[in-house]
Amino acid sequence: MRGSGRASSAITIVNAFATGKGAAIGIELWTEARVRVTGDGEVRGKIVVKGEEFKDYRLVNSVISVLREVTGEPFGVRFEIHSDIPVGKGLKSSSAAANSLTKALVEALRLNIDDLSIVKLGVEAAKRAGVTITGAFDDACASYFGGLCITDNYEMEILVKREINPETVVLLIPRETVLTESLKGVDFSKISPFIGEALRLAISGEWKKALVINGLLYSTFLGYDLAPMREALKLGAFVGLCGKGPAFFAIADEPEEIIEAWSSFGDVIATSLR
């Protein structure tokens, strides 16, 4: 039995680290998973990220473990995952991988599971794999459904779900990598009152203001160089931090100006909201 699944990257509007509630918007960078379920109990396959093989299989094994519990069957899997989403940059690569693989397995196993439950299974797998701090339910929803998703990550409840115009978004991908597990134990409580204000802005519809406040707060707190944000703000852009970083993103009337201004800071990708 075969199945396939597809899920996207997303940008952070409000990071849930400080309050447990977060907001994200899907963007047009994709991860695709193809699977074949077997009866031999073996798991074999490959992950290819931006043309290079990726050999961390923790999340794959966690997704399979969760689905084995759902079915009660020790099925085997042959899998292929191909992704355009850089890993360790804050661009929701784990959420996209969990969503796409879970969706593919649900299809292959012919399970009658709705979309939101698929997302929640992927979040559970991500928690078990240790690739998320809060569960990243906001990221997972934006990755799966697209649009603006505002969620309570601890309760796994969607607070707001709204369609978004497909504006151009410019991504700055620095060379360094920051894995989410490296931030376990960091106390974000000191910035939670301010992040709470950003969340209220996002809920009220002013998500562009929210992403700037969120980006400035988390970038400062985590010690990132603010030069990319400063350059984008000078050009009138709405600029934020992708997850825990180090990637930044900007939404501007003249995206070409942002691309030029950011070219000296790292790799730059232009895509769109979805």
From Swiss-Prot:
> Where is the secretion signal located?
none
GO MF annotation: an example: shikimate kinase activity
Question: Which pathway, per its entry?
Answer: Metabolic intermediate biosynthesis; chorismate biosynthesis; chorismate from D-erythrose 4-phosphate and phosphoenolpyruvate: step 5/7
A single cellular component GO annotation:
cytoplasm
* UniProt superkingdom: Archaea
Q: Which HAMAP family match?
A: Shik_kinase_arch
Can you name this protein?
Shikimate kinase
Q: EC number(s)? A: 2.7.1.71
Which family is this protein grouped under?
Belongs to the GHMP kinase family. Archaeal shikimate kinase subfamily.
Q: Which reaction does it catalyse?
A: shikimate + ATP = 3-phosphoshikimate + ADP + H(+)
Q: Which GO terms describe its biological process?
A: amino acid biosynthetic process; aromatic amino acid family biosynthetic process; chorismate biosynthetic process
Q: Which PANTHER family match?
A: HOMOSERINE/4-DIPHOSPHOCYTIDYL-2-C-METHYL-D-ERYTHRITOL KINASE, SHIKIMATE KINASE
